[in-house]
Amino acid sequence: MAEAGWNMKWILGLSLTLCLVVQTALGALHTKEPLLITKHGILQGKQVHVGDTPIQVFLGIPFSKPPVGTRRFAPPEPPLPWNGIRDATTYPPSCLQESWGQILSMYLNTRKQYKWLHFSEDCLYLNVYAPVLAPGAPLLPVMVWFPGGAFLAGSASTYEGSELAARGKVVLVFLQYRLGILGFFSTGNSHARGNWGLLDQIAALRWVQENIEAFGGDPDSVTLFGQSAGAMSVSGLMVSPLAQGLFHQAISQSGTAVLKAFITPDPLTSAKKIAHLAGCDHNSTKVMVECLRSLSAEEVTLVSKRMSFFQANSHKDPKEIVWFLSPVVDGVVFPEDPVVLLTRGQVKPVPYLLGVNNAEFEWNLPFLMKIQLNQRMMNQTNINKILWSFNVLLNITKEQVPVVAREYLNDAISNHDWKMFRNRLIDLIGDATFVYATLQAARYHRDAGSPVYLYEFKHHASSGIIIKPYNGADHGDELSYLFGSPFSKGSSAGEEKEFSLQMMKYWANFAHTGNPNGEKLPYWPRFDKDEKYLQLDFDTRVGVKLKEKKMAFWSQLRQSQKP
């Protein structure tokens, strides 16, 4: 009888497994609670509709073991398989970050209702949005989103992927990676090499290669896309040997690895500051790392706050300011500085779409960096102090500060024109950072043989939480249009929806073919020696040589710096 009972259980178990396999194979994901078999186990998601298009949504899928305990400051490890059916209908915790990450998420939120974030060290999860495929239908291109946030903040759950997945006919993956101290702490040696956040990203891309076909995605057609720090990450992975073969197109929105702040040249200096604030001072980096591993998540967050990351301070020696922890040349993710590799043309020539917004420093970044833009700044002494405090981000020497002020600000100061001064300062910081680095990256990839498409996003987007005075496109303003917020939030005018549809089509076309052009879209020329680019706005049009005179100024300034 015992043997008969065991046989009956075995038969029932086998029957359930076969049912699930058949259910998946026959497109049974049309059900309200779709089931799906991955390499690590069975997932139960949910189904939503965009018009008549059903989208399957799977949230909180683990792509690594939790990076806690001895796995803190260590490369991610593949997740363990699970028994039974794993619920994938609720948003996962976001990676540990300071409270301002919540504000950033509210500002960038693309969903109809804001999802309040929960922070945890156990955060290596991803969200997938996939159109339901008919039996026998071809696999869809995959787009993997890298959230931004200065390597200090960001969450996969800030973004809603249903609109882009449905209208672009793509499978969307939103990943998360460790941030701040937990993601980028490095002693510069084998005790803590660093780049943990980038290794998380690479682990997520490996998960995509192994599992995405089950969601209807094509592992041989993967496009990376990201914004700000996410865009820098995408740009960096394009020259990393660890990421080769894991993607086939790339998109960088407002950020590339050419930005000076992308690489931390002396990570041990920052590591010692962190250790000191944590009470982990020691001459041995091994002991230092072991001590930091013993801290609770709350203690790590407290140390992060005491480091005053991403906060401007014109009264402090710029050499003492640690804007954020960033990637390092570790000999693993990056054998050499990415800019050196790009200069040599050591990059796989995949199609690359990249661009900037025309007012990157309007409100979002100054607010997060606690910079008060006011008329007290309008004198030569104060502006010199402010510009010098930004020297790491602007990549200027102390001797070049008055040269930069003269180029952008002096006439506004002499005319006591506050509006002109403010707008020029916005241009100055945006030009020196995002615009210059993006153009340089476009040229490097073009010269290496990649098809390159450049844009400048110009549409002034309204925000649900702030009224911005400058009539330009702020850092992150393109995201609501890219992810279809005018449709999902349901309160936008027809022009906003048409513009959003245009952006989604460009990005999806690029994911499908490596070329953004398509039917009924304004033509987007390749970025060749003539340096044509697309100005994205309600009246989208072609431009030539983005900010040519200002870029010549910055190029000459950088070339005059001592090596």
UniProtKB/Swiss-Prot annotation:
Its main location: secreted. The active site is at 228 (acyl-ester intermediate), 360 (charge relay system), 475 (charge relay system). One of its GO terms (cellular component) is extracellular region. Glycans are attached at residues 283, 379, 395. It comes from the Eukaryota. Disulfide bonds join 95-123, 280-291. Its EC number is 3.1.1.-. Gene3D superfamilies: alpha/beta hydrolase (3.40.50.1820). One of its GO terms (molecular function) is carboxylic ester hydrolase activity. It is an enzyme of class 3 (hydrolase). It is found in: Secreted. Residues 1-27 form the signal peptide. Keywords: Disulfide bond, Glycoprotein, Hydrolase, Secreted, Serine esterase, Signal. Belongs to the type-B carboxylesterase/lipase family. Probable carboxylesterase. This is Carboxylesterase 4A. It comes from Mus musculus (Mouse). The gene is Ces4a.
